[in-house]
Amino acid sequence: MRKTEFIDKACDPATLTAGQLMQDAVFTCTPRTDVLSIVRMMTTWNFGSLPVVEEDRTLVGLVSEYDVLQAVIEGRDLRKLSAADIMTRQVLSVTEDMNLVQIANLFQDRYVTRLPVVRGTKLVGLVARRDLLFGYVKACQYWS
């Protein structure tokens, strides 16, 4: 559930933060998760990427559709690969206190659609472009 669904008072939409905009119920995988399971989750739930976390929720990577397709192009057998084999390790992320404008700039500059939200090194949520739009519209209902 989006945290912005709980906005019920006046708020300048531009001051909304990742902590307010993010979805905190996040599907994840571990570095040991097999790639076919990841692909099943991505296609079943219509995700373009899946955060890779350790047992303590430390964000260690991201598996995207691009990563999976790159493995296919390279002729790798997806049945024999784990997330650690194909994941992007240098993950662009945001912190809970980053505001809507800062996050929107990252989306526009880096051509991404979803970003992990971290507290230190721990994954606490995901924020998508659509979450920014939803939060903006919701906040505008109360702001003049």
Kindly give the residue locations of the regions a language model identified.
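Tandem CBS (Cystathionine beta-synthase) repeat/Bateman regulatory domains
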Residues: 1-144
